[in-house]
Amino acid sequence: MEGFGSDFSVGGSSAGKVDTGAIMEQVKVQIAVANAQELLQRMTDKCFRKCIGKPGGSLDNSEQKCIAMCMDRYMDAWNTVSRAYNSRLQRERAKM
């Protein structure tokens, strides 16, 4: 009689083996989605607080312009920081 959980043993059939590559890809996708959601949430919070003085049923023209400009600046800043961070990571990895 085989032991409990023998489908995941090192030897034997590949039917029960875990595909770690596929799992890693799924985790990477989930992390990317979570990061994008967090970026969007932070940007929305900051721009709302900056641009909306008195919340109402709709945005006036100046509020719309303020939000658009705020979001553009936020994304530009995030992209600049992201590029600098990735560049630094690459330099650090090259030193290893």
From Swiss-Prot:
InterPro entries for this protein: Tim10-like (IPR004217), Tim10-like_dom_sf (IPR035427)
Compartment list: Mitochondrion inner membrane
Bilayer disposition of the protein: Peripheral membrane protein
Molecular function GO labels: metal ion binding
BP GO annotations: protein transport
Key word GTP-binding present: no
Keywords: Chaperone, Disulfide bond, Membrane, Metal-binding, Mitochondrion, Mitochondrion inner membrane, Protein transport, Translocation, Transport, Zinc
GO cellular component entries: mitochondrial inner membrane
Motif (Twin CX3C motif): 47-70
Disulfide bonds: 47-70, 51-66
Subunit structure: Heterohexamer; composed of 3 copies of TIMM8 (TIMM8A or TIMM8B) and 3 copies of TIMM13, named soluble 70 kDa complex. Associates with the TIM22 complex, whose core is composed of TIMM22.
Stated role: Mitochondrial intermembrane chaperone that participates in the import and insertion of some multi-pass transmembrane proteins into the mitochondrial inner membrane. Also required for the transfer of beta-barrel precursors from the TOM complex to the sorting and assembly machinery (SAM complex) of the outer membrane. Acts as a chaperone-like protein that protects the hydrophobic precursors from aggregation and guide them through the mitochondrial intermembrane space.
Domain comment quoted from the record: The twin CX3C motif contains 4 conserved Cys residues that form 2 disulfide bonds in the mitochondrial intermembrane space. However, during the transit of timm13-A from cytoplasm into mitochondrion, the Cys residues probably coordinate zinc, thereby preventing folding and allowing its transfer across mitochondrial outer membrane.
Protein family according to the UniProt entry: Belongs to the small Tim family.
Protein name, per record: Mitochondrial import inner membrane translocase subunit Tim13-A
Gene: timm13-a
